[in-house]
Amino acid sequence: MGSYKYMETILIPAFILLLSLNYVMPCNLTVNFYDKTCPKALASIKRSVWAAVASNPRNAALLVRLHFHDCFVQGCDASLLLEGAGSEKASPANDGVLGYEVIDAVKAAVERVCRGVVSCADILAVAARDATVAVRGPSWTVRLGRRDSTTSNAAEAVTDLPRGNMNLNQLIDNFRRKGLNAREMVALSGLMCFFVLPLYY
């Protein structure tokens, strides 16, 4: 239990940082974007995400990783979810990314509540938050109103996403191009430890 408390002191700044990335968030986002058009959307997302995490706690990490990979290429626009040759999803940079079926199930649940209203980009953002809360991580306010991309580029995923074989200077440069400094890079890079390590102990 103590390790969770310790991790919260690291996670809260990391998530605030992730959410404050100006390059991925348009100015017109609001917390009440779906209040009139789909008032049950957030409850539906939460229910689906919590069920997925209850069935397999690893799903929390998968959802956060999906959101990170989506936001790091073209911004938080759900371009990672687009399929086809030459798409981000098909890029070698996203070979190890899992959890698409969880997002598909969440999207299906939202569509049953209000068809064609809630963007996949917003579903990814809210699902990452709800998954974090489901494993006793911090919560934060998610501003809504993102639009889904109609384009996806595998080459951009290769050039934009940090890779495991990058040295320190390359990683710092990679994050710097996204407006992040070395300290912020460490916070975001270490974020997955919170999700993955407790599953092994």
Which residues fall in each region the model found?
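Folded extracytoplasmic luminal domains of secretory or organellar precursors
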Residues: 2-201
